[in-house]
């Protein structure tokens, strides 16, 4: 069966997350319904990242199999037509070999977390970032973030309902960059635990506000105790930006 790789962008606000769920409409369900609509097939797509409710994506990747071959541009355009008015776009479709897996072939996932740090309420960016009114020290946040780089037990920053077999992960990038009122937090790893990024970002916000010292971040990590986590950052500031694969 021909296999296709899809590059996907979406606004996560209206959805219960990427994965199909009984309690609401998911991104996966919307795309499967659209693909099934124009192909006449019952299809299943497999994503690289299972984003939570409210989390956005600019570079989600999925793979899907069909019983017949399609021109990639026809597949992309037909899928987008059937997806309207859902806030989901198939940016690219390409034919891949049968061994390719959007999830298991991935070697790195890149996330961006956006904070707007100002007293005034949000207008244009509402629902697209975390609005924090109290002044944040982005330099201290970046310093604290560096203590989490490398291979660690991230139990402190793991959701209590996380189903991963191991809390061990290798964090490859964790940078905090400020440009005026905008704070961007860039994170990269091969894989993440459930709510790991939002848990780490929420804890960094404690550092930025002065509630935590820089050293408290490393101490929270070392505790391997979920109760030592700071707040969990809201989902609307998180974006799955890119998924990397080994070049063929």
From Swiss-Prot:
Catalyzed reactions: uridine(38/39/40) in tRNA = pseudouridine(38/39/40) in tRNA
Keyword Metal-binding: no
Catalytic residues, chain numbering: 52
Keyword RNA-binding set for record: no
Signal peptide stretch: none
Entry binding sites for substrate: 111
Family annotation (InterPro entries): PsdUridine_synth_cat_dom_sf, PsdUridine_synth_TruA, PsdUridine_synth_TruA_a/b_dom, PsdUridine_synth_TruA_C, TruA/RsuA/RluB/E/F_N
UniProt keyword annotations, A-Z: Isomerase, tRNA processing
EC top class named in words: isomerase
EC number(s) given by UniProt: 5.4.99.12
A Gene Ontology BP annotation from the UniProt entry: tRNA pseudouridine synthesis
Any one GO molecular-function label of the UniProt entry: tRNA pseudouridine(38-40) synthase activity
Subunit architecture: Homodimer.
Functional description taken from the UniProt entry: Formation of pseudouridine at positions 38, 39 and 40 in the anticodon stem and loop of transfer RNAs.
Similarity remark: Belongs to the tRNA pseudouridine synthase TruA family.
Protein name: tRNA pseudouridine synthase A
């Amino acid at each position: 069966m021909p296999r296709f790789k899809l590059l996907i962008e979406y606004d996560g606000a209206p959805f219960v997350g990427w994965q199909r769920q009984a309690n609401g409409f998911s991104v996966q369900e919307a795309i499967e319904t659209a693909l099934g609509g124009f192909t006449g097939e019952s299809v299943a797509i497999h994503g690289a990242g299972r984003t939570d409710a409210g989390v956005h994506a600019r570079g989600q990747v999925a793979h899907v199999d069909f019983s017949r071959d399609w021109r990639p541009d026809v597949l992309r355009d037909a899928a987008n037509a059937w997806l309207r008015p859902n806030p989901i776009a198939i940016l690219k479709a390409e034919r891949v070999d049968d061994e390719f897996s959007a999830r298991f072939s991935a070697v790195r996932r890149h996330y961006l977390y956006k904070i707007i740090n100002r007293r005034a309420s949000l207008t244009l960016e509402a629902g697209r970032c975390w609005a924090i009114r109290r002044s944040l020290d982005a330099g201290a946040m970046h310093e604290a973030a560096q203590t989490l780089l490398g291979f660690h037990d991230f139990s402190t920053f793991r959701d209590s309902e996380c189903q991963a077999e191991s809390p061990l992960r290798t964090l490859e990038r964790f940078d905090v960059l400020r440009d005026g009122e905008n704070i961007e937090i860039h994170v990269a790893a091969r894989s993440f635990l459930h709510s790991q990024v939002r848990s780490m970002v929420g804890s960094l916000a404690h550092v930025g506000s002065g509630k935590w010292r820089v050293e408290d971040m490393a101490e929270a990590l070392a505790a391997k105790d979920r109760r030592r986590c700071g707040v969990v950052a809201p989902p609307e500031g998180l974006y799955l930006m890119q998924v990397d694969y080994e070049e063929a």
